[in-house]
Curated annotation (Swiss-Prot):
Listed name of the protein: Integral membrane protein GPR137
Cellular-component GO terms for this entry: lysosomal membrane
Cytoplasmic topological domain residue ranges: 53-60, 111-140, 197-217, 296-396
Entry's transmembrane regions: 32-52, 61-81, 90-110, 141-161, 176-196, 218-242, 275-295
Predominant place of localization: membrane
Task performed by this protein: Lysosomal integral membrane protein that may regulate MTORC1 complex translocation to lysosomes. May play a role in autophagy. May activate Wnt/beta-catenin signaling to modulate epithelial cell function.
Lineage: Eukaryota, Metazoa, Chordata, Craniata, Vertebrata
Gene name tied to this protein: Gpr137
Keyword Glycoprotein included in the entry's annotation: yes
Key words of the record: Autophagy, Glycoprotein, Lysosome, Membrane, Transmembrane, Transmembrane helix
Regions of this protein lying in the Lumenal compartment: 1-31, 82-89, 162-175, 243-274
Highest rank taxon of the organism: Eukaryota
Length: 396
């Protein structure tokens, strides 16, 4: 590697871009940020067990991916305290785990975000169009296929790069084109899902609020993810197109594979290391932190007086994420229907009559009968009717 560097850059004119103390401080700051995120996600996973949430859900899968991602990034930056040369001479598997796998994990979190909002949209439409359930399976298969393609391309490029079996320019071109194109496609699909969620706000808001968020919060987080991931992909594609083939290591366009730049730290100074850290903060740490906050574990509602009744089931005003997937199958019309029935029931009870009591005869006691039939007898019970108490919504 030293011969390659000597042919590219003359060693006589090189001076450190940053003092050693600043470099050490940057390394400590990077490591501390990723370690803090690691312990935060680790605590969230323990809260899942403590609160008795579902162990396999969108939330737990996302948190597990973020935990692995933060652990790999923390391990990578820990090398830069004293053992930078060792980090640059890793075998194919450790090289891929530390440098390439975190990007794959980030793409998986983006597809997971897409799948969640696609599920929200499909569940809102499934009430009137039951065949939409088959479309949801097709969309899930498409995102799984995209994830596998992303993983396969990155693994092959990492192995070929370490074994020197292909030209570096060809490997970079293939990886950047495939990976960043998939990032852009997933970002655009996320934007489309957010538009559909916003258009169907009355029906989708019930599902989102039952999971501990709202349409505005989901749109804000999703919009930020679209901007961050799309800008990252555009940056990589533009920098690769503008970089000359004879000087692949001139700038940190390949920022998610820092091994192309890490072996230049001692020779070119630390300017590239500073740029790499800033880019990782904006395009890796920031979006992951936002998503961790979005998928955070909520405490189950304790006070039933602040809960709402929806189709015979109790929902807190801030119930937790992704733990009751079947609660809001019937949004929209069912919610409005149950709310109108609850209003009628409360009006009948508030008039002084016992729930289910038969109205008095007209003219009884000199007063005219103006009340309507109580709610209990407003509908003819079907063969599948259930007993309804004051705390359950009538099932139709």
């Amino acid at each position: 590697m030293e011969s390659n560097l000597s042919g590219l850059v003359p060693a006589a004119g090189l001076v450190p871009a940053l003092p050693p103390t600043v470099t050490l401080g940057l390394t400590a700051a990077y490591t501390a940020l990723y370690a803090l995120l690691f312990f935060s996600v680790y605590a969230q996973l323990w809260l899942v067990l403590l609160y008795g949430h579902k162990r396999l859900s969108y939330q737990t899968v996302f948190l597990a991916l973020c935990l692995l991602w933060a652990a790999l990034r923390t391990t990578l930056f820990s090398f830069y305290f004293r053992d930078t040369p060792r980090a640059n001479r890793l075998g194919p598997l450790p090289f891929w785990l530390l440098y390439c796998c975190p990007v794959c994990l980030q793409f998986f979190t983006l597809t997971l975000m897409n799948l969640y909002f696609v599920q929200v949209v499909f569940k809102a439409k499934a009430k009137r169009r039951p065949e939409m359930s088959r479309g949801l399976l097709a969309v899930r298969g498409a995102f799984v296929g995209a994830s596998l393609l992303f993983l396969l391309v990155n693994v092959l490029c990492a192995v070929l790069s370490r074994q020197r079996q292909a030209q570096p320019w060809v490997l970079l071109l293939v990886r950047v084109l495939v990976s960043d194109s998939l990032f852009v496609i997933c970002a655009l699909s996320l934007a489309a899902c957010l538009c559909l969620v916003a258009r169907r706000a009355p029906s989708t808001s019930i599902y989102l609020e039952a999971k501990g968020t709202s349409v505005c919060q989901a749109a804000a987080i999703g919009g930020a993810m679209v901007l961050l991931y799309a800008s990252r992909a555009c940056y990589n594609l533009a920098a690769l197109a503008l970089a000359p083939r004879s000087r692949l290591d001139a700038f940190d366009y390949d920022w998610y594979n820092v091994s192309d730049q890490a072996d230049l730290v001692n020779d070119l100074g630390n300017k590239g290391y500073l740029v790499f850290g800033l880019i990782l903060f904006v395009w890796e740490l920031l979006p992951t932190t936002l998503l961790v906050g979005f998928f955070r574990v909520h405490r189950p509602p304790q006070d039933l007086s602040t809960s709402r009744i929806l189709n015979g089931q109790v929902f807190g005003s801030r119930s937790y994420f992704f733990d009751r997937a079947g609660h809001c199958e019937d949004e929209g019309c069912s919610w409005e229907h149950s709310r109108s029935e609850s209003t009628s029931m409360s009006g009948s009870l508030g008039s002084g009559s016992w729930y289910g009591a038969i109205g008095r005869e007209p003219g009884w006691g000199g007063a005219s009968q103006t009340r309507t039939t109580p709610l209990l007898f407003s509908q003819v019970p079907g063969p599948g009717s259930h007993h309804h108490s004051l705390y359950s919504t009538p099932q139709t």
